[in-house]
């Protein structure tokens, strides 16, 4: 089962590293990770590109706020299940997404 995870970002370089790291540690084998950045002015995009091998798509363009950004991510997603991981959030443990997939 493919799980799509969407993170909306804007100038998130101070918090995003830990978010990316928590996703990198996930054990579920089929994760589509989409990051939607609202044209950050800091080093958010550079941080994403240099610290995450699981990012499937990066959408970087101005948006009308977090809900617009999340909707762009949903439109780009191809997973059976779609979830959100905000740029200052962490997944609690390494099997979190695998456990979510088991419920479906």
Predicted regions mapped to residue ranges:
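Short, well-formed alpha-helical segments that are part of the catalytic scaffolds
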Residues: 12-25
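Glycine-rich, basic loop-to-helix element that forms the pyrophosphate-binding segment
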Residues: 60-77
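Active-site acidic Asp-centered loop
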Residues: 38, 85-87
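Acidic donor-binding/catalytic loop of UDP-sugar-dependent glycosyltransferases
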Residues: 43, 68, 89-103
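A conserved acidic beta->alpha catalytic loop
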Residues: 37-46
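Short aromatic/hydrophobic "clamp" motif used to bind/position activated sugar donors
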Residues: 82
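Cell-envelope/extracellular polymer assembly enzymes that use nucleotide-activated donors
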Residues: 1-4, 32
